[in-house]
Regions:
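The feature marks proteins involved in alpha-glucan
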Residues: 1-30, 52-144, 154-169, 173
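C-terminal beta-strand-rich structural cap/linker in extracellular carbohydrate-active enzymes
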Residues: 4, 37, 88, 564-578
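Carbohydrate-binding surface patches
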Residues: 30-32, 516-552
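Hydrophobic faces of well-ordered beta-strands that scaffold small-molecule active sites
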Residues: 143-145, 196-198, 242-244, 330, ...
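Aromatic/acidic polysaccharide-binding cleft in carbohydrate-active enzymes
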Residues: 150, 372-374, 378, 419-426, ...
């Protein structure tokens, strides 16, 4: 409710869950609250020990909360508390821009300071150490490179006309394999990549391999288990991690369990491995199958993971490849169509084998319910992708809205998760960003700057560094640009420089956001970050014409390695050391 110019009570939101109230470790506790945008002059957190009575010791403390994120309609305030309490009781003190003051505890508002602990929020999460959101220490802000193996590199001669065919079809066999990736490992490393992610490599009859027929076999067209072991070893020698694609939502029709159902029908002992509505099975092209499958594709029947046999089989598969080849992560295909119950057990199983395994979910929307520390570590950040599409490709949002959309995710996601978000501008499931921008390379130039200069794990889709084109799937999966005549060397050097700057100045992605200025009419964004003694201004010009930033002249521009003259060209960026 809004009463004249007074505080907007209905916009205030806090919950005692792992998004708004959680222990980062044994000594650090984070509390957040959401309020109406620009409504508050000051937010103060009051907290005290739940179990020590006042007559014994006064444990009451207060701490000013910092505004850490801004979305379209809300501000997010945060307090980080160093504490050694068994259990915490707390409440908020709000003072709005008109001077009105109110206290908020246990989901109730009060005009007087709260003294009754029963009227405060109660959070014992620092006691429950087994529930703390622990993520792999190696992962935060690392740079990921996505490869579609059949189209990346081949070890046998492939007709050049076929390799660079456009548009390409699912039937075009380019003979890419694991050995080809191994032979180009130096190229991947030289770009500055930290994590290599491959789409499915297990046995399948399709080009994309998302319809698995044998989870325990590398597809023969890609190589052998020994090839995968060598690939992982060579990646590790270069300081890179390897993530594989886990397709556990569905199988292919030739997978042994479904093949048995096709042969034996109702008498099959595997009939409960899937969701079958009736016999005989119907899956002719053009008709809706009478069994659950991925997207009504009869060639991808959905597994019944609530069946203990199926759950064990799939979990054993995941653990097997960790033990066998020492991989570093699983990317979970169609992860949001599988139950929370399964993923909780899955996490326990794979983390027991390798504690610092990275678990990445595929989900195209906000994923807070999967990111509470007991399922996934992070997700493919499609909201980031859609935000950039809206800003640069479709030009339907302002720079202010773009920054606000970024703020929404930061304000809602767990502190440990945010630096692990896989920020992408395209993937094997989307048209290339360049295509969506009508081949405007300047727009991709700027999109890469956003991708590589913001917190998270930027995921570069193979070939983006050479400005590879491509429409929607399957055309986005063309043969990699290995011949210089096809490569955009200027784009490559831009990607490489962005990665170098990102890695050489931790302030860029780890620094606290100390200021944000957006000019909608000009189409410009300036983000100020501070980290210890270093302060950096990141300037993004989202318009087609050059803009002046005279306040930063004579400072050093990390991207050009020259003194900044105050000018930023259209669809360009600058990183200024202050």
């Amino acid at each position: 409710m809004k009463r004249g110019n007074f505080m907007e009570y209905s916009a205030i939101f806090h919950d005692m869950d792992k998004r708004f109230s959680y222990a980062v470790d044994k000594d650090l506790f984070v509390i957040r609250v959401q309020v109406k945008k620009d409504d508050m002059k000051e937010v103060i957190l009051h907290y005290e020990d739940k179990y020590i009575p006042m007559e014994r010791k006064d444990t009451r403390k207060t701490v000013p909360m910092k505004k850490v994120a801004v979305s379209q309609f809300h501000d997010y305030y945060e307090a980080q508390i160093k504490m050694h309490l068994i259990c915490l009781r707390y409440f908020f003190e709000f003072t709005d821009t008109q001077g009105e003051k109110v206290y908020y505890g246990n989901y109730e508002f009060d005009k007087e300071c709260i003294t009754n602990r029963d009227r405060m929020f109660d959070c014992p999460q620092n006691l429950r150490e087994e529930e703390m959101f622990e993520v792999p220490e190696w992962a935060a802000n690392k740079v990921v490179y996505q490869i579609f193996p059949s189209r990346f590199a081949a070890t046998e001669p492939v007709d050049k006309e076929l390799w660079y065919k456009a548009p390409i079809t699912p039937m075009d066999d380019l003979h890419g394999n694991l050995r080809g990736i191994i032979e180009h490992m130096d190229d991947i490393q030289n770009l500055g990549i930290d994590v290599l992610y491959m789409t499915p490599i297990f046995q399948s009859n399709s080009c994309h391999k998302y319809d698995t027929t044998d989870y325990y076999q590398i597809d023969p067209s890609f190589g052998t288990t020994e090839d995968l072991k060598e690939l992982v070893q060579k990646a590790h020698e270069r300081g890179m991690k390897v993530v594989l694609d886990a397709v556990y939502n569905h199988t292919g029709r030739e997978f042994f369990a479904f093949a048995d159902i096709l042969e034996n029908g109702e008498k099959s002992k595997y009939r409960d491995w899937y969701f079958i509505d009736g016999f005989p099975l119907k899956s002719e092209w053009g008709e809706i199958p009478n069994f659950k499958c991925f997207g009504y594709y009869g060639g991808m029947p959905k597994l019944n993971l609530k069946n203990p046999e199926v759950e064990k089989y799939i979990t054993d598969v995941a653990c097997y490849w960790i033990k066998e080849c020492d991989i570093d992560g699983w990317r979970l295909d169609v992860g949001d169509e599988i139950s929370h119950f399964f993923w909780k057990n899955f996490r326990k199983a794979v983390k027991a084998v390798k504690k610092d395994m990275l678990i990445i979910g595929e989900i195209w929307h906000y994923a807070g319910d999967f990111l509470e520390g007991d399922e996934w570590d992070t997700v493919m950040n499609y909201p980031f992708y859609l935000n950039l599409i809206d800003l640069l490709a479709d030009e339907k949002i302002t720079v202010s809205q773009f920054v606000q959309n970024l703020g929404y995710l930061k304000g809602r996601l767990h502190k440990n998760c945010y630096p692990l978000m896989w920020n992408l501008i395209d993937s094997h499931d989307t048209a290339r960003f360049l295509h969506l921008c009508n081949d405007n390379k300047k727009k991709q130039h700027l999109a890469a700057a956003f991708q590589l200069l913001l917190p998270g794990m930027p995921m570069i889709y193979y070939g983006d560094e050479y400005a590879m084109p491509g429409a929607n799937d399957p055309d986005c999966r063309r043969g990699m640009y290995w011949d210089e005549e096809y490569q955009d060397k200027e784009m490559y050097e831009w990607y490489k420089r962005l990665i170098q700057v990102r890695k050489s100045h931790a302030c860029i992605v780890e620094g606290e956001l100390a200021g944000s200025v957006t000019e909608d009419e000009e189409g410009t964004i300036v983000l100020i970050r501070k980290n210890g003694e270093e302060t950096i201004a990141m300037i993004f010009n989202c318009s087609s014409s050059a803009k002046k930033f005279n306040e930063y002249t004579q400072k050093y521009n990390l991207l050009t390695e020259n003194t900044f003259d105050g000018n930023v060209e259209g669809f360009d960026a600058a990183v200024i050391v202050l």
